[in-house]
């Protein structure tokens, strides 16, 4: 199978075209800006798969229509999906801009006094606004000398934020969401909206009945040698939790072994359906070997599958993690209960950070008063204003135990290329595999159980679709919280102690949906949410603006909000601007 190439970032150095001294005096400085931008991005950003980002610089500086067209021809042949235009001087606005309406674009105008880079920036942005092709503005806060080749910190922040979000847009385009099954228990997110994927994300939806998974398992449409490797790996690494089922529902050793085998097979077959597997072609199964070009997937499970077959918890947990029997690798994005909208939030988070994502129910708001009444203990520290219990039936990425460590030795979740084998082993050691509760899952299964370490910064997100409006994005930055063991045990037992738990405390602003923790819970738009490592809400906001998805709820500092310059023309209130601009421009891939 031919590997689909990764999108690249195109750098467009633009210049004043007047010869006889003007252009000649600017060539080196302008091209050096392009090279510095490319070097920064190549050094600081990777694709979600871990590959280094490639930047393509125009062959010459661009002064007008001819050189602009030559640049576009080069970019078109090299899979450029994002562009950054750079200049230290005045150039000819609409004659030099990137006119591709589907491609995220930014312009960095050098803040210097010798030549008017800011004037070109303003003129070019005016052209973008007038033509209905939004672009992001980058302009340093402080004046630099003409021979200063450094990139100021504020410029760097915008360049990198734009590049991360732009690459996410380009990476999703042309891929598919694999819907295995249909609607799970009436959950709206599993009513997969093809128009949303096509118009806003540039993706297709591949709908496959769960009987295809059954067929692959029953007819051995998988790598049998890999299954043996997976079973041996599980035997070595799985630590089993208490079977809380009544005696009549407990399975014997042989039955448990069969459940484990099928759970691992589900992971293998869903993965193969997503990305393909050349080993299947070697078995003569060429069609099945191709996969569905899926960058994300969802598995319905409940109840049409789980009432008679093992649930998807083990398969989903392992696929969503950064490691399995094949070692450390890029995590997949697989949504529980085929909640495609939570799957999209997972996809956004993974593309922006390269890390595994925690899929969870936004289950319970615990007020300080309720916690004290139930446990006799008071919440304190980050938890003092109350907490939200994020928990689901064992499908969260195992990275979520936060047994990985950052450069300061603090608990975190890292992109897979930074994870050591010891850290992967620590996440596995922190996880118990509990027999599924029969009342929920009659077909059995194993649910992963872990507790997220406290004090870790997270960003919780969710995409919802509103009739008459379209998709909206919710964002809540906050922290995981570590509770005293006795308190945790009491609260955890009131829900389901066989599932993974993250205690989450959002950062409060005292206003609107962030007035208090209760308000965050009350304003959340669905039963599911996603945790992405770090306070990265600003990156989500930039990405949403590129896709024309308004943000209906966030607690990101206003200074960090970065949207296309044309948003400022849509009113004076920053969030109202977002709604009006998204409505005005419509979805990125209008259908």
From Swiss-Prot:
UniProt superkingdom: Bacteria
Localisation: Cytoplasm
Residues noted as binding Mn(2+) in the record, renumbered to the chain: 337, 361, 528
Reactions catalysed, as given in the entry: L-fucose = L-fuculose
Pathway assignment: Carbohydrate degradation; L-fucose degradation; L-lactaldehyde and glycerone phosphate from L-fucose: step 1/3
Any Gene Ontology CC annotation: cytoplasm
Keywords in alphabetical order: Carbohydrate metabolism, Cytoplasm, Fucose metabolism, Isomerase, Manganese, Metal-binding
Pfam families hit by this protein: Fucose_iso_C, Fucose_iso_N1, Fucose_iso_N2
Signal peptide: none
Summary of the function given for this chain in its UniProt record: Converts the aldose L-fucose into the corresponding ketose L-fuculose.
Subunit structure, interactors included: Homohexamer.
Family, per entry: Belongs to the L-fucose isomerase family.
NCBIfam families xrefs: fucI, PRK10991.1
Official protein name in the record: L-fucose isomerase
Gene that produces this protein: fucI
């Amino acid at each position: 199978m031919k590997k689909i190439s990764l999108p690249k970032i195109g750098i467009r150095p633009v210049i004043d075209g007047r010869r006889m001294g003007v252009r000649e005096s600017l060539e080196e400085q302008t091209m050096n800006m392009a090279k510095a931008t490319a070097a920064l991005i190549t050094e600081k950003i990777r694709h979600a798969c871990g590959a280094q980002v490639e930047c393509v610089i125009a062959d010459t500086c661009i002064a007008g229509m001819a050189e602009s067209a030559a640049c576009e021809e080069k970019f078109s042949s090299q899979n450029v999906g994002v562009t950054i235009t750079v200049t230290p001087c005045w150039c000819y606005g609409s004659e030099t801009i990137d006119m591709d309406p589907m491609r995220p674009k930014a312009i960095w105008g050098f803040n210097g006094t010798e030549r008017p880079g800011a004037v070109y920036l303003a003129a070019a942005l005016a052209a973008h606004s007038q033509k209905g092709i939004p672009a992001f503005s980058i302009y340093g806060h402080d004046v630099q000398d003409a021979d200063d080749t450094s990139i100021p910190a504020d410029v760097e922040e915008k360049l990198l934020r734009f590049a991360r979000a732009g690459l996410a847009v380009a990476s999703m385009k042309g891929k598919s969401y694999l819907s295995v099954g249909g609607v799970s228990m009436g959950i709206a997110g599993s009513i997969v909206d093809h128009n949303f994927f096509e118009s806003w994300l540039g993706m297709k939806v591949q709908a496959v009945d769960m009987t295809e998974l059954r067929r692959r398992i029953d007819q051995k449409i998988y790598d049998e040698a890999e299954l043996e490797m997976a079973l041996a790996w599980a035997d070595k690494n799985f630590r089993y939790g208490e079977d809380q089922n009544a005696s009549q529902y407990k399975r014997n050793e042989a039955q448990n072994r069969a459940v484990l085998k099928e759970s691992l097979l589900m992971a293998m077959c869903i993965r193969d359906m997503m990305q393909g597997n050349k080993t299947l072609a070697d078995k003569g199964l060429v069609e099945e070997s191709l996969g569905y070009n899926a960058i994300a997937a969802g598995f319905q499970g409940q109840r049409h599958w789980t009432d008679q077959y093992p649930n998807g918890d083990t398969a989903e947990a392992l696929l969503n993690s950064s490691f399995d029997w094949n070692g450390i690798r890029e995590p997949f994005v697989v949504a529980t209960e085929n909640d495609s909208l939570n799957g999209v939030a997972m996809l956004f988070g993974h593309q922006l950070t390269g890390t595994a994502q925690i899929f969870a129910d936004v289950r319970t708001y615990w007020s300080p008063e309720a916690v004290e009444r139930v446990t006799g203990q008071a919440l304190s520290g980050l938890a003092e204003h109350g907490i939200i219990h994020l928990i689901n039936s064992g499908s969260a990425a195992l990275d979520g135990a936060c047994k990985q460590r950052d450069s300061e030795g603090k608990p975190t979740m890292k992109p897979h290329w930074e994870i050591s084998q010891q850290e992967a082993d620590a996440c596995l050691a922190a996880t118990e595999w509990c027999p599924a509760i029969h009342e929920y899952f009659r077909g059995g299964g194993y649910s992963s159980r872990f507790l997220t370490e406290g004090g870790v910064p997270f960003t919780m997100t969710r995409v919802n679709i509103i009739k008459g409006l379209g998709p909206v994005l919710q964002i809540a930055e906050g922290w995981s919280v570590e509770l005293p063991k006795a308190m945790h045990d009491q609260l955890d037992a009131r829900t389901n102690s066989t599932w993974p738990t993250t205690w989450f405390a959002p950062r409060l602003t005292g206003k609107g949906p962030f007035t208090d923790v209760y308000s965050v819970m009350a304003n959340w738009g669905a039963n599911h949410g996603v945790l992405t490592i770090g306070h990265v809400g600003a990156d989500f906001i930039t990405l949403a603006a590129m896709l024309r998805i308004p943000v209906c709820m966030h607690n990101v500092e206003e200074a960090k909000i970065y949207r296309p310059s044309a948003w400022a023309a849509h009113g004076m209130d920053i969030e109202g601007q977002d709604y009006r601009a998204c409505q005005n421009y419509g979805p990125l891939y209008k259908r």
